[in-house]
Amino acid sequence: MASEQQMITPFLPELAREANGNRIISAGASSYGYDMRLADDGFRIFSSVFGLEIDPKHFDESSLIEPMLRIADDGAKYYLLPPHHYGLGVTVETFKMPRNVTGLAIGKSTYARAGLLVNATPLEAGWEGRLVVEIANLANLPLRVYVNEGIGQILFFESDEDCAVSYSDRGGKYQGQTGLTFAKV
């Protein structure tokens, strides 16, 4: 269904666990879902250096900093998320949800076992765009967050009929996002 309806671009039709001869955190099509990848553009971390508080109704971008993209010995690229910090990223993939399918983005157990929490986020019927991924390092140590590798999984739920009013129909505020999009009211 995902490839026929072009729901995911670019689409990896099989679960990839290796790239360039190195093990990666899995990405691509899985049993009833898709392991989405974190892109190497737009990643930001909340910091008190410039921001005093976070107000989701009046979001101030100065509360975010852009961390350095690092390269591991094996060539893998990653961001280092400090202990007890929260970050925002965006997926490599662009999603286009049909009117009869809703998705739910959840975290991966590989990251959860290392202390990383990925916020559960719906991909409503009719929504399209690159998904903003909200992540938290709950550990007491800095945590590597790899780009172009799996960051979470999307589970798909298909209905027998189209929804009456889609995310697009009601003019959803995050419709068509192509990069990191901050909180809106």
Model-derived segments and spans:
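Non-catalytic terminal segments and appended small domains
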Residues: 1-185
